[in-house]
């Protein structure tokens, strides 16, 4: 994928790219009559607005309306960068507030198509405080259980990024777009420009995907139906994959089978379970764990299920935070959650500690414990201590025959107890880590499969 900007689109051009044909209808929103040269009586402000209106054909820096995207109806907020750099002023705030209010009244998701340099200088602090208005509308929309899926274009900087962009539930970005809180004219002279791009924000966990303009309609058409289909019914646990070898005979047999490279991993389970799925990426705190935690939403038997799945590696702090983000989003939207447990344990290297491993695991424990939406868990491999338990649903966890769950790895337990290596296998039996042991102990509900 190219990392060069794909060209700037006007507000109506970007609407035409994402909306189903002939479905966009502009909202009949009223805005305040401006004072001469604005609230600060800024010399030449009226003339600047008049030139912007003549050049773009718009009366303000946003165009708001409804449309269908992939058949799903949504409120669209399209920024016109040609109108004073897509900046936010008082009248912009009026339009944004009215659009969000309409979305809540009609139970519609909001899709901001953002391209802005930030707050409008000619309106001073009154422009800056529009960010508080926008944040309030976003918060009310969250409380209403409605999704917000942002598309950040070139450029998206300042308060527009810090509210409508980064504050959305899901963030898509155009390739090569300038994206960041600091715009090009205010960042340090020696700053690396590559850090202020869509691709850099993806790597930093602030963007979920980089999508080419011609693919936006399809991408949004996958996201919106999934995020607007609540269900109070728990997700059923997946059927087991792989051979039917029966339950393990010993604790060490359970460990050996769970660690086998031939055992199906999370990606195989997700592919078998979902008709189609879309992934979220990143913890919104500067990190990602794409090799350790898979998170997103998919369709299972005609309804949406959210998923957070460990891949069999040591889970990084960013992975736990991404899973917590996923569960809280699903909870707000009323979507059931499926988690797949498979890790030898949380990453325990020095870098993981610096990244806040303990706090990240604690956050996931709380997200699962506090979820009102039903959470179903399946242990598909290694259940390594608290790093695995954090993802498991209390009272609704199941296990495959190729799995185990333990307070600690048998080798480490033997070492702590100062037992010789030959005692590792008996220690595994003593720990009672087999799936059938876990059922008998009341740790899990049952096993899946024959």
Predicted regions: what is each one?
Residues 67, 71-80, 95-120, 297-311, ...:
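A structural preference for short, pocket-lining loop segments at secondary-structure junctions
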Residues 10, 91, 129, 159, ...:
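Charged, alpha-helix-enriched surfaces in structured cytosolic catalytic cores
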Residues 49-51, 78-87, 309-314, 348-351:
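Short, basic, glycine/proline-bearing loop/turn elements
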Residues 116-232, 344-450:
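Conserved catalytic cores of soluble enzyme domains
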Residues 1-69, 73, 217-305, 309-312, ...:
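Intrinsically disordered, low-complexity segments enriched in small/flexible residues
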Residues 81, 89-92, 96, 130:
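Conserved mixed alpha/beta catalytic, RNA-binding, or beta-rich assembly cores of soluble enzyme
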Residues 142-143, 310-337, 355, 366-373, ...:
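A structural preference for long, well-packed, hydrophobic secondary-structure segments
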């Amino acid at each position: 994928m190219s990392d060069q900007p794909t060209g700037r689109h006007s507000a109506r051009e970007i609407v035409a790219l994402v909306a189903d044909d002939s479905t966009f209808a502009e909202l009949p929103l009223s805005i305040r009559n401006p004072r001469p040269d604005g609230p600060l009586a800024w010399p030449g402000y009226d003339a600047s607005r008049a030139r912007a209106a003549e050049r773009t054909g718009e009366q303000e820096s946003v165009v708001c309306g409804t449309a269908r995207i992939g058949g799903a109806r949504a409120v669209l907020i399209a920024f016109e960068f040609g109108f004073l750099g897509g900046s936010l002023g008082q009248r912009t705030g009026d339009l944004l507030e009215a659009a969000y209010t309409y979305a809540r009244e009609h139970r519609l998701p909001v899709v901001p198509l953002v391209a802005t340099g930030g707050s409008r200088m000619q309106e001073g602090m009154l422009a800056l405080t529009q960010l508080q208005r926008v944040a309030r509308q976003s918060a009310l929309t969250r409380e209403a259980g409605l999704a917000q899926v942002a598309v950040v274009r070139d450029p998206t900087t300042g308060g527009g990024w810090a509210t409508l962009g980064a504050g959305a539930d899901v963030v898509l970005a155009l390739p090569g777009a300038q994206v960041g809180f600091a715009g090009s004219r205010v960042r340090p002279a020696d700053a690396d420009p590559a850090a202020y791009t869509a691709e850099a924000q993806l790597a930093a966990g602030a963007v979920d995907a980089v999508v080419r303009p011609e693919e936006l309609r399809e991408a949004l058409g996958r996201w919106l139906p999934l995020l607007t289909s609540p269900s109070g019914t728990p997700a059923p646990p997946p059927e087991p994959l792989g051979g039917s070898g029966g339950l393990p005979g010993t604790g060490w047999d359970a460990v050996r089978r769970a660690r086998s490279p031939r055992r199906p991993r999370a990606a195989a389970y997700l592919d078998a379970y979902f008709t189609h799925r879309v992934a979220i990426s990143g913890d919104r705190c500067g990190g990602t764990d794409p090799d350790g935690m898979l998170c997103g939403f998919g369709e299972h038997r005609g309804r949406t299920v959210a998923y957070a799945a460990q891949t069999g590696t040591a889970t990084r702090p960013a992975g736990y935070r991404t899973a917590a983000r996923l569960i809280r989003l699903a909870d707000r939207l009323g979507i059931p959650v499926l988690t797949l447990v498979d890790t030898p344990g949380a990453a325990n290297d020095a870098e993981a500690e610096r990244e806040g491993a303990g706090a990240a695991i604690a956050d996931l424990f709380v997200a699962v414990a506090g979820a009102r939406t039903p959470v179903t868990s399946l242990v598909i491999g290694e259940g390594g201590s608290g790093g695995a338990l954090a993802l498991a649903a209390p009272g609704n966890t199941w296990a495959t025959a190729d799995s185990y769950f333990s307070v600690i790895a048998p080798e480490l337990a033997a070492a702590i107890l100062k037992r010789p290596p030959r005692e590792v296998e008996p220690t595994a039996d003593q720990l009672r880590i087999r799936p059938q042991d876990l059922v008998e102990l009341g740790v899990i509900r049952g096993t899946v499969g024959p």
